[in-house]
Design a protein with these regions (language model features):
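Acidic/His metal-coordination segments adjacent to aromatic residues that form catalytic metal sites
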Residues: 97, 101, 156-163
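Inter-helical turn/loop segments and adjacent helix faces that build the functional surface
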Residues: 160-165, 184-194
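Amphipathic alpha-helical packing segments from all-alpha helical-bundle domains
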Residues: 137-160, 168-179, 198
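Helix-turn-helix
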Residues: 18, 33, 41-79, 83
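Hydrophobic alpha-helical connector segments
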Residues: 79, 93-128, 135, 145
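Basic, helix-initiating cap at the start of DNA-binding domains
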Residues: 2-41, 54
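C-terminal peripheral helix-coil segments that are non-catalytic and often amphipathic
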Residues: 4, 18, 187-243
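Short, basic, alpha-helical segments at the C-terminal edge of helix-turn-helix-like DNA-binding modules
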Residues: 81-89, 137
Length: 243
């Protein structure tokens, strides 16, 4: 009870000392400081072994404010991953703009590979997360949702609208590719991630073949013909069946 009263007092005292809202640039910067600190601890500690107090001390943020901004260590870790994903997507977008005429498939592969490049210095953190999801199903769901979010952005900016049920299936399919290739990436010590690139290309080809061989939705003749036209268009733009 005493600890909880002290935490409440810290929050109220810090709120009274500042007239800025929690969405102000200063608060955003402090949130990222906390996220960076949580991410740093994750390299050598499992999620269960990291306390918000440890994170606050590392970031140099008062405990009460850390509780108000972060809420939990898991939330801070996901915040850091969202920032890394945003960096990967925006840098890929810049590369795509400078690449000229390339297929949708090439753009998607470039986006996925660059995400692996961004996370390469943080394999220790990913290994800890892989352990944590075994006992934290909510974390597994949030990581899956976050992966699908970044995959959707990569697909859309590459030219695949990812709309409707078929679009959702493509998003989930590419997310599945990322998970499978991630196992290869964790062991890839080549300087240019050549092994990861090869596995990514192979898995994408396999996913494309499955996507064209499995007619998930049938419907009437008109719908099938429309679906065939759409599939042919996407296949061509993805670099499949381009004679």
């Amino acid at each position: 009870m005493v600890c909880w009263q002290k935490l409440q007092k810290d929050v109220f005292d810090e709120a009274a000392m500042s007239t800025q809202s929690t969405s102000s640039p200063s608060s955003d910067a402090q949130l990222m400081m906390l996220a960076d600190a949580a991410w740093m601890h994750l390299e050598s500690h499992s999620l269960d072994k990291i306390s918000l107090t440890m994170v606050a001390d590392q970031a140099g943020v008062p405990m009460g404010l850390a509780a108000a901004l972060g809420g939990s260590v898991q939330r801070l870790v996901l915040c850091k991953m969202a920032a890394l994903d945003r960096q990967a997507v925006l840098e890929t977008y810049g590369d795509i703009q400078d690449a000229g005429a390339v297929s949708i498939r090439e753009k998607i592969v470039e986006g996925l590979l660059h995400r692996f490049e961004i996370y390469t210095p943080y394999r220790g953190q990913i290994a800890m997360l892989n352990q944590s999801v075994r006992t934290h199903p909510e974390l597994a769901l949030r990581l899956a949702d976050q992966l699908e979010s970044v995959v959707r952005r990569i697909l859309v900016m590459s030219g695949d609208p990812a709309e409707g049920m078929r679009g959702q299936i493509r998003v989930k399919g590419v997310a599945g590719v990322c998970i499978l290739v991630g196992r290869v990436w964790m062991k890839d010590d080549s300087p240019d991630l050549a092994v990861t690139m090869k596995a990514l290309d192979q898995r994408m080809t396999q996913a494309e073949e499955w996507g064209h061989s499995l007619r998930v939705f049938g419907g009437g003749r008109q719908q099938r013909e429309g679906d065939a036209d759409q599939d042919a268009d996407l296949a061509g733009r993805y670099g499949v069946d381009n004679d």
